[in-house]
Amino acid sequence: YNDFIMSKSQKETIQINSGDITLEALLETPTHSTRPPCVLMCHPNPRQGGSIYNNVLDSSSSSLIKKGIASLRFNFRGVGASTGIFGDGDFEGSDALTVIDFASRIDQIDGGRLGILGYSFGAGIALEAASVTSKVKSMVSIACPQRRFSTFGTAEIVQPKLLICGDRDHDFPSGHFKFLSGRFTKPRQVEIVNGADHFFSGYEKLLGDLVGKFFQETL
């Protein structure tokens, strides 16, 4: 029964203005918490069907709710009900910063305790956002594309970070992922999920548990 209570949440679709673009977002808040911390979520590449409705984001959000943490997923420009044209990474970083700014002012969450999570293409955007704003207190990168991941890792991301990759990711040999992860400043946690490929099918609960525990400890 207690598990049932702890997993209850309220979902609300909201629109966020980003310049002349309107972004569609989904705010999910735990009903058992007052002004909880919140994790922003960046989705995979829409050219491969990515949006806020995704197995990795779903499992992460469910796990966070059980920990008393809200989530705010948003569709990048040109995706779902978000207006504009998808920018292939050129404008999505600024969309993320707009959403972070918006989240810091939402009454029902604690705007001083914001985290960010990104999956695949979205992980690159989350890393970019975390490198330029102190409003994000911790961040999670899941299956960031190798080429994008390799552009980070110097001192620019000072927040606690959890870096995750499957050992069967078609894009990223786990040995190279481990090597590149070592270039990130501490505090950092590196997790290679044995048996998981880029899509984490069948590994959602394990992933959600990693994400929930990390944000519970860092927000």
What annotation goes with each model-predicted range?
Residues D167-F172, H198-F199:
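Acidic catalytic loop of the alpha/beta-hydrolase fold
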Residues D3-Q15:
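A domain-start/cap signature at the N-terminus of enzymes
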Residues A96-Q159:
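Primarily recognizes the serine-hydrolase "nucleophile elbow" in alpha/beta-hydrolase
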Residues R183-F199:
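Catalytic histidine neighborhood in serine/cysteine hydrolases
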Residues I16-I109:
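Serine-hydrolase catalytic machinery in alpha/beta-hydrolase-like enzymes
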Residues I157-V158, L163-C165, D169:
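Short beta-strand/loop motif that positions the catalytic acidic residue
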Residues F172-S181:
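Short alpha-helix in the alpha/beta-hydrolase fold that links the catalytic acid
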Residues S201-F214:
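Post-His helix in hydrolase/transferase enzymes
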